[in-house]
């Protein structure tokens, strides 16, 4: 709405100026332009709601650093493990600092496939760290997990760009080439003197499924590391809610529902998915809902362990916490 403060930068392509930048106050013209360009969601600053676990401007900064790291890796076929460790520590520190009963996970929407690649790594680091923290991992374990998550797709630098960013569904031969990114990624880790088995497994095995239907090896539950099982959830969720040239984004609610279904079918780790839902809720930030009072609202935060009782903003601008409201329930998702 006009007058609200944007919490993300939106641009349609690298060679065009942003429609709106982080921190800008929205004007009526900006709102109309966003609608005309098909932008469905825009995160705005909402007072009296818990700050996001990682601020959007911080995500933007980390994305640019990942972009530089991937660029260097494309030339040298190796990464500076100290740079990755520093980024990992930033993510872990922010999330641990902001981890409480009331959480707000805000992810950035990218309109460009290449930019998606970089922000996807940051999102994977954030989501994986949240799952790990909720699952009781210690700081040193979280650091390794986050490290693996923010380079889990590093091997894609060796996949031809015309295939990686093809504005269509890939054919079988092309998809086989894309699959190799996990193998390429583990090689880059070795070239970079990254020897931690947890990190290498997170990079190499994040597309494995517990029922053996994943790739590259078709490994099953007992053969897949905790790190890879966590990153798999983060990878799928962020991919589903993201715009790509060949598909539209799913709503956060639909994506969560798909994650839960994959766990029930034995593809994703059920306990880790429960930890994920515990922190992001059944109705993630950005979900539009209808209440039994007839009012419409948008989810702006969640209470850990209260998956069906998010923090909402009503159409009149009032914020309410369903965990503290008796008799008020969600009856329908409107996304």
Write out the residue ranges for each language-model feature:
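Acidic/His-rich, divalent-metal-binding segments that scaffold phosphate/diphosphate chemistry
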Residues: 46-179, 186, 190-196
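Short alpha-helical linear motifs
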Residues: 111-112, 165-173, 203, 223-227, ...
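Terminal helices and disordered tails flanking the catalytic cores of nucleotide-processing hydrolases
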Residues: 1-86, 90-91, 249-335
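Short hydrophobic/aromatic segments of transmembrane alpha-helices and their interfaces
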Residues: 14, 139, 221-222
């Amino acid at each position: 709405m006009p007058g609200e403060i944007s919490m993300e930068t939106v641009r349609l392509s690298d060679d065009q100026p942003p429609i709106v930048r982080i921190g800008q106050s929205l004007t009526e013209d900006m709102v109309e332009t966003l609608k005309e360009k098909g932008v469905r969601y825009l995160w705005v600053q909402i007072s009296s709601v818990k700050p996001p676990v990682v601020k959007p401007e911080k995500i933007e900064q980390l994305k640019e650093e990942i972009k530089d790291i991937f660029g260097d890796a494309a030339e040298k076929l190796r990464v500076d493990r100290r740079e990755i460790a520093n980024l990992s520590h930033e993510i872990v520190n922010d999330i641990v600092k902001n981890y409480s009963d009331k959480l707000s996970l805000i992810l950035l929407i990218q309109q460009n496939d290449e930019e998606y690649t970089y922000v996807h790594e940051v999102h994977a680091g954030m989501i994986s760290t949240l799952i790990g923290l909720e699952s009781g991992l210690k700081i040193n374990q979280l650091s390794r997990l986050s490290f693996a998550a923010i380079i889990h797709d590093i091997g894609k630098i060796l996949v031809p760009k015309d295939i990686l960013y093809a504005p269509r569904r890939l054919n079988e031969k092309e998809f086989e080439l894309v699959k190799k990114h996990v193998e390429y990624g583990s090689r880059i880790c070795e070239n970079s003197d990254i020897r931690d088995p947890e990190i290498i497994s997170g990079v190499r095995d994040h597309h494995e499924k517990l029922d053996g239907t994943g790739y590259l090896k078709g490994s099953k539950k007992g053969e897949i590391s905790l790190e890879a099982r966590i990153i798999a959830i983060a990878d799928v969720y962020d991919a589903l809610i993201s715009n790509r040239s060949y598909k539209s984004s799913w709503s956060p609610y639909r994506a969560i529902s798909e994650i839960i279904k994959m766990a029930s079918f034995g593809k994703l780790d059920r306990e880790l998915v429960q930890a994920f839902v515990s922190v992001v809720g059944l109705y993630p930030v950005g979900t539009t809902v209808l209440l039994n009072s007839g009012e419409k609202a948008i989810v702006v935060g969640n209470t850990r362990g209260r998956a069906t009782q998010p923090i909402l903003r009503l159409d009149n601008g009032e914020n309410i916490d369903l965990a503290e409201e008796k008799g008020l329930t969600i009856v329908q998702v409107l996304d």
